Curated annotation (Swiss-Prot):
The gene is rpsD. The keyword RNA-binding applies. SMART domains: Ribosomal_S4, S4. Belongs to the universal ribosomal protein uS4 family. GO terms for cellular component: small ribosomal subunit. The lineage of its organism: Bacteria, Bacillati, Chloroflexota, Chloroflexia, Chloroflexales. Keywords: Ribonucleoprotein, Ribosomal protein, RNA-binding, rRNA-binding. This is Small ribosomal subunit protein uS4. GO terms for biological process: ribosomal small subunit biogenesis; translation. The keyword Ribosomal protein applies.
Length: 206
């Protein structure tokens, strides 16, 4: 599936949120939107539609999901009983690439997506190379045994980086085994901060 590979700094400045660590560093240095009239653009009042669109774009870029798949996730969330926006965020959090990132096996979601694509991740012992796969409570996500001898994964364990990593409460990390278990569904506070999911619901409900 295609991915956005453009300048993360410009996107972070336009949306007002760091979509990656690099984007956050750039945003901290220069918060105005990109372009000749960046400061004026920040002062300009957004329409309701503009605010809704911006929130959708934030979520898409933060989680690395393109429009077609994002809309599919929204439609899935809207068919559920309960709060649509919160369930949408739960679906985004439970993407396999995001879980690999949350467990600390990767430093960015883009890197996590690459690890999944290259077949380094197993779910319940089965190789799963689909980043958009939705994990379920009780499933075990781990680095494939054949991949653990690779320098990257050995360094994760030997350096103690994983031992210091704090996974969210809905995931239980076993650093020594390079694995993690989904022990609960993610709550609203477990999702990325700075997203107003109600505006996303309003965008698709127009």
């Amino acid at each position: 599936m295609a991915r956005y590979i453009g300048p993360v700094g410009k996107v972070s400045r336009r949306l007002g949120i760091g979509i990656t660590e690099k984007g956050l560093r750039i945003l901290n240095k220069r918060s105005d939107p990109p372009g000749q009239h960046g400061a004026a653009a920040r002062r300009r009042q957004l329409s309701d539609y503009g605010m809704q669109l911006r929130e959708k774009q934030k979520a898409k870029f933060l989680y690395g999901v393109l429009e077609r798949q994002f809309r599919r996730l929204f439609e899935q969330a809207s068919r559920r009983s309960g709060v649509t926006g919160e369930y949408l965020l739960s679906l985004l959090e439970r993407r396999l690439d995001n879980v690999v990132y949350r467990l600390g096996f990767a430093t960015t979601r883009a890197q996590a997506r690459q690890l999944v694509n290259h077949g380094h991740i197993v779910v319940d012992g089965r190789k799963t190379n689909i980043p958009s796969y939705t994990v379920k409570v009780g499933q075990v996500i781990a680095v494939r045994p054949q991949s653990r001898s690779r320098t990257y994964f050995k360094n994760l364990v030997d350096s103690g980086v994983l031992n210091k990593h704090r996974a969210p409460e809905w995931l239980r990390l076993n650093a020594a085994e390079l694995s993690g278990t989904v022990v609960a569904l993610p709550r609203r506070e477990d999702a990325e901060a700075g997203i107003n999911e109600q505006l996303i619901v309003e965008f698709y409900s127009r």
